[in-house]
A protein has these predicted regions:
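Aromatic- and glycine-enriched beta-alpha-beta binding-site module
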Residues: 2-63
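Long, contiguous internal "core" modules enriched in hydrophobic/ aromatic residues
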Residues: 45-147
Length: 148
């Protein structure tokens, strides 16, 4: 296992911290969401994280969600969104069903550009976007009528 974790082969000591939030709403009109960020430090250090949405019904705000992620990513590096979106799409593809799980999002790992402050700011931005998207988009759906 040490061979699989950058920097752990040289020294098995490490530090890790992270935040993981999973939203499982009562209303089927509000999609399930997952968000996580992490910082790992071995003899090397990097950030990782992401977020994705898995709706129960057609999710009309999918384009708005992806556009917001793209704007966030482009603020730091224009290559982030296409790269991180593909990583998420590949990670959450259900091969046995030949279909994606949900509408995707972004996923990244081993983010270490050499500018720790900028990398940390991006990770904070991911968390802020998750919060803002729930507050500004999903909360409005909580009072919509649902027929069971």
């Amino acid at each position: 296992m040490r061979d699989a974790i950058p920097g752990a082969k040289e020294d098995p000591n490490y530090n890790a911290t992270g935040i993981s939030v999973v939203l499982h709403p009562v209303s089927p009109k509000i999609p399930s969401m997952h968000f996580n960020t992490r910082f790992i430090k071995t003899t090397q250090e990097w950030f990782g994280g992401g977020m994705d949405i898995t709706p129960c019904v057609i999710f009309e705000d999918e384009k708005k969600y992806h556009r917001g992620l793209e704007v966030l990513c482009n603020k730091y590096d224009k290559s982030y969104y296409p790269k991180f979106k593909k990583w998420c799409d590949d990670y959450f593809f259900l091969k046995h069903r030949n279909e994606p799980r949900g509408v995707g999002g972004i996923f990244f790992d081993y983010l270490q550009t050499g500018d720790w402050g900028k990398d940390f700011e991006f990770v904070q931005g991911v968390g802020t976007y998750f919060h803002q998207f729930i507050k500004n988009t999903l909360i409005a759906l909580k009072d919509e009528a649902v027929s069971y």
